[in-house]
Amino acid sequence: MQKAAKIVTIVVLCALLALFVPYALNSDVSAAGLFFAAASLALFGVCAVLAVPRLFAALQTDEPLPPSALLGPRSMRFSRAHPWFEIVSAVLISRLLLFLLAWLINTLVNGYQGGMWNTLETLWLRSDSPSYLGIAERWYVTEGDPRFHIVFFPFYPLVIRLFSYITGGYFSSAMLVNVLCAAGTAVYFYELCALEMPRQKALRTVKYLFVLPAAFFFAAPMTESLFVLLCVSSMYYLRKKRVLASCVLAAFAGFTRSAGVLLAVPIAIEGAVALCAAYRAGEMQLFKKDLIRRVLCIFIVPLGLLGYLYVNYTVWGDALKFLEVQREHWNQSLGLFFHTAAYQFDYAVNAVKSGDMRLLFGLFVPNLAAAFLSLGVMVYGAKKLRPSYTFYFLAYFAFSIGATWLLSAPRYLAAAFPLPIALAELAKRQRMDIVLTLALLLIQVAYLGAYVLGGPVY
């Protein structure tokens, strides 16, 4: 296995090099931009190289005992007491604090414009939010400006429409959906982490999910809250060996955002680990049965994306219409993730030269910081996280950050669930935990302020 791991590592490095060399020879970015591209690729490569041996180790070793197996009878009573009420209460209080903070920031800058609840829609209905509410109200159309809404996936608007029958309005429905999804995400994420770490560490990991700089988007009428709920619940059921439930939830994640289909990566890796364990144990009947079950189930995962393509076809007569709209209306397509680092840096330099500090600190600096810092954290985490989580992050990062006109790196990366797990590993010591938590909260407050004040935060 060590020899195989070395071969795979060499193949990965050669593949990354094969991508970068022709890019470097033909790119029109600046020399400094090219350096940023190389740095991004290097961090990505280090993360992959560290994850490969862990993957092969997982394929040839049995699953370690869960933390609860190491506890005595008295401690087990505490271990089994799920802190769901405390988790949900903390999430609900944090939502109220976010709404209050957004209102205070706007009031301090723009003067009193009404109470917190009266100005809620004005402050939070920004960026892509009106598009999702428009789809919820009118579905997809082929005329006027709403025709461009075809680039947005349908599951979140469908959920908004469903809850609108309860709330009586689409905005209130979206806010309710996001609060419920945030609470559900916190509970499922805790349960997922508690499968392999002590209670307090699992709670700390949940905390880091909600203190990430762009985590306030979990409260905004956007897909993030629903998407992360589907992702972490899918992973929870996967780890509990309920593969069908995991793949169905992954399919719904793919019906919410295109990146949902990437959940096939950890599902496949965890499946391979389980199958290898059954094979080593000589349980051939179980091995064959589990192999058939997992192979059949993983084909469910892309059904969400296929459902979105079918929506494109029924509305426009073209299953790939969204690609055309993205390309022609937003100049958006899928590119190389390390090129994003290059052009974002060059755009940042141009913003400095033109004196556009609003664009510099609202868009380019957050994008670059989110991309590089997340890779740096995952380089540390790759030595400790499950390899399925690390490879999912790498696939998610390459896909999400590889946009040819990236606007939302902090928001996209806030939805990458392996990142807070790596942060919790990084902040093992209490002092580090306090410093990191406060730093992330302060950045989130600043980023929230830029969002509610109409800055280039998307």
What is each residue range found by the language model?
Residues 94-110, 124, 253, 260, ...:
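Membrane-lumen/periplasm interface segments of specific transmembrane helices
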Residues 123-168, 343-348, 400:
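Short hydrophobic/aromatic helix or loop-helix immediately within or flanking a transmembrane segment
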Residues 147-154, 158, 166-187, 217, ...:
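Loop-to-helix entry region of an early transmembrane alpha helix in multi-pass inner-membrane enzymes
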Residues 161-162, 176-196, 373-380:
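Transmembrane-helix motifs of polytopic, lipid-linked glycan transferases
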Residues 210, 214, 232-237, 244-269, ...:
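Membrane-interface alpha helices of multi-pass inner-membrane proteins
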Residues 172-173, 184, 189-211, 245, ...:
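Transmembrane-helix signature of polytopic, membrane-embedded enzymes
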Residues 188-191, 208-211, 226-245, 419:
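Specific aromatic-rich, kink-prone transmembrane helix
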